[in-house]
Amino acid sequence: MPEELSKKQTTRLNKLQKRLRREVGSAIADYNMIEDGDRVMCCLSGGKDSYAMLDILLNLQQRAPVQFEIIAVNLDQKQPGFPEDVLPAYLDSLNVPYHILEKDTYSIVKEKIPEGKTTCSLCSRLRRGTLYGFAQRIGATKIALGHHRDDIIETLFLNMFFGGKMKAMPPKLLSDDGANVVIRPLAYCREKDLEEYAELKKFPIIPCNLCGSQENLKRQAVKDMLNQWNRQFPGRIETIFTAMQNTAPSQGVDREQFDFVSLKRDPDAPMKGDVAEANLPAFDFLDIANSGHIDLDAAKRIDIVNVYEV
């Protein structure tokens, strides 16, 4: 039997639960992740994030203004040492409908990936394909994954540094074939909060390194960089995520996102200065007649004292 929490731990758990519930609720509302009548397939890996996601979604299910189903699904990829009884026992205790799928992707990965190389990428693709197909079989209208805010930010920098793309993990995604909608209810949640929540809730965590593969070194390098920034500049990670939600294509350089080629000056636009010059008289700098000069009152005149050439 798990040890009972102290009064201090119980208080902390309640605060964390409220925060995570609020953040998940906000993400669901902001991106219209869950709608009335949805059948949500909640993908469980046995890690802290997916446990927390299921726990919070079950909690919100009792309070949400819409009705939706939750079906938990785990894919047993036949990794050596995988404890097959852990998830069924946990899900039975919650009285949650669930499916355990069995597919030996481990052997496929070991056959295709050279010894010593990271297998996570191929393993993830094989897992995703199986889960997408099963979602259609059971009539799931949404597939919920346990990626959190840190995952999203890390993916942005991974793609920037190593892929040359401004691309992250969207909170809501339509699969390429249009058959599945993927949602990430933990998109606003911090990893450290989820770690603490999982520890206090005493989820039966299954390690993700049973296959023997080391975590992607590039992702770990990005994670270390972000952690260092967070220590050195508190609040920077929050600012990065806010920036990701406030993009301005017209202020970038991506011609696919904004039509720079067709930009033309409007010759009929009213003659006025820039916003920074709102109090100055308006004139046309391109008008040859005034040669770019205008007479100002002495009080408004700026004298140039010295000009230095570099």
From Swiss-Prot:
InterPro entries: Rossmann-like_a/b/a_fold (IPR014729), TilS/TtcA_N (IPR011063), tRNA_Cyd_32_2_STrfase (IPR012089), tRNA_thiolation_TtcA_Ctu1 (IPR035107). GO terms for molecular function: 4 iron, 4 sulfur cluster binding; ATP binding; magnesium ion binding; sulfurtransferase activity; tRNA binding. It is found in: Cytoplasm. GO terms for biological process: tRNA thio-modification. A motif (PP-loop motif) lies at residues 45-50. It comes from the Bacteria. Its cofactor is Mg(2+); [4Fe-4S] cluster. Binds 1 [4Fe-4S] cluster per subunit. The cluster is chelated by three Cys residues, the fourth Fe has a free coordination site that may bind a sulfur atom transferred from the persulfide of IscS. The keyword Transferase applies. It catalyses: cytidine(32) in tRNA + S-sulfanyl-L-cysteinyl-[cysteine desulfurase] + AH2 + ATP = 2-thiocytidine(32) in tRNA + L-cysteinyl-[cysteine desulfurase] + A + AMP + diphosphate + H(+). Its EC number is 2.8.1.-. Catalyzes the ATP-dependent 2-thiolation of cytidine in position 32 of tRNA, to form 2-thiocytidine (s(2)C32). The sulfur atoms are provided by the cysteine/cysteine desulfurase (IscS) system. NCBIfam families: PRK10696.1 (NF007972). This is tRNA-cytidine(32) 2-sulfurtransferase. It comes from Shewanella oneidensis (strain ATCC 700550 / JCM 31522 / CIP 106686 / LMG 19005 / NCIMB 14063 / MR-1). The lineage of its organism: Bacteria, Pseudomonadati, Pseudomonadota, Gammaproteobacteria, Alteromonadales.
